[in-house]
A protein has these predicted regions:
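Conserved residues at the C-terminal ends of beta-strands
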Residues: 43, 63, 94
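Residue-level detection of beta-strand scaffold positions
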Residues: 1, 62, 79-83, 88-89
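Conserved acetyl-CoA binding element of GNAT-fold acetyltransferases
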Residues: 52-64, 112-115
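Alpha-helical elements of Rossmann-like donor-binding domains used by nucleotide-donor carbohydrate transfer enzymes
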Residues: 14-15, 35, 74, 78, ...
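Conserved acetyl-CoA-binding loop-helix of GNAT-fold acetyltransferases
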Residues: 62, 68-81, 104
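Acetyl-CoA-dependent GNAT
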Residues: 1-51, 58, 117
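Conserved active-site alpha-helix within GNAT-family acetyltransferase domains
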Residues: 73, 85, 89-91, 95-118
């Protein structure tokens, strides 16, 4: 969603461990010389509107100083490949500031996202 956040180490560790156990989740990490420069977190699920399985990018982030180098595109293309192996008919993503990035990769704007903090 192109927002800044601060990772709480304990929460990250438990969430990451749980994600690694899930069949419907995928995490990619982009590294350069041992440094993490980006990541993608995605899932898939069944949906009526897609008449089957949909994969969605929950989070995609690339370090500001590494943007424009194809890192995000490479991770997104790899995610699309995973989605195909899962028989997904669509890949979806919500974004606020990266619309031009997704449009350049043939994604189309289809909805407005709402949220409610619980």
């Amino acid at each position: 969603m192109a927002t800044s956040f601060f990772v709480q180490t304990d929460q990250f560790r438990s969430t990451f461990a749980e994600l690694m156990e899930r069949d419907d989740a995928l995490v990619f990490v982009a590294e350069e010389q041992g440094d993490v420069v980006g990541y993608l977190l995605g899932f898939d699920h069944l949906s009526f509107y897609a008449n089957g399985r949909v994969s969605y990018v929950e989070e995609l982030a690339v370090s500001a100083d590494r943007r424009g180098q194809g890192i995000g595109q490479h991770m997104l293309e790899a995610f699309e490949g995973w989605a195909k192996t899962r028989s997904s008919t669509l890949v979806t993503v919500a974004t606020r500031r990266a619309a031009p990035f997704y449009a350049a990769l043939d994604y189309e704007e289809t909805a407005i996202l709402f949220r409610k903090v619980l």
